């Protein structure tokens, strides 16, 4: 491979790496799927609690409101990023609280833990079987988008690591 080709390839990889780190990419491949998981969990809780368990019903609506708030933040960050505007808020409500505590990444990690816990609960409790067909397809879409994007980033990072080690070792 000639030097110009190598430089061109590096520029392409740098551009790809920047794309993976952009708020638009992060919002729509992580944030929005997480909002869908929360929303469907909350709706399922309200459905199960309706008329029989007021606490589960109220809890479900709180989760729905949380999901909608997070969705507004993620979509807004994605749009502002595409417009090259400042991003005056975090990806989710919990991280926004973390912003005021000067630890937004810690709170974002807590939100991630809670969301993965929701996914696990939906699976292990078999609540996932209570989703309507359109809700199930929405769940599948969110899962696919989230996992495929994570896999693409992992593959990309391994290629970059391999190239860096190959170049540094000769």
Task: Indicate where each model-derived feature is located.
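Alpha-helical transmembrane segments and their membrane-interface junctions
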Residues: 31-41, 109-138
């Amino acid at each position: 491979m000639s030097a110009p080709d190598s430089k061109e390839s590096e520029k392409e990889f740098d551009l790809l790496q920047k794309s993976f780190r952009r708020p638009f990419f992060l919002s729509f491949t992580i944030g929005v799927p997480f909002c869908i998981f929360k929303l469907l969990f909350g709706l399922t809780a309200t459905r199960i609690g309706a008329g029989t368990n007021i606490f589960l019903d109220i809890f479900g609506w709180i989760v729905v409101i949380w999901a909608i708030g997070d969705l507004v933040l993620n979509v807004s960050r994605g749009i502002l990023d595409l417009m090259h505007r400042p991003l005056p808020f975090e990806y989710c409500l919990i991280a926004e609280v973390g912003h005021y505590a000067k630890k937004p990444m810690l709170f974002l990690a807590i939100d991630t833990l809670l969301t993965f816990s929701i996914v696990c609960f939906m699976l292990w409790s078999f609540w996932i079987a209570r989703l309507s067909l359109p809700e199930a397809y929405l769940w599948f879409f969110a899962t696919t988008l989230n996992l495929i994007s994570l896999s693409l980033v992992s593959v990309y990072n391994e290629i970059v690591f391999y190239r860096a080690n190959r170049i540094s070792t000769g």
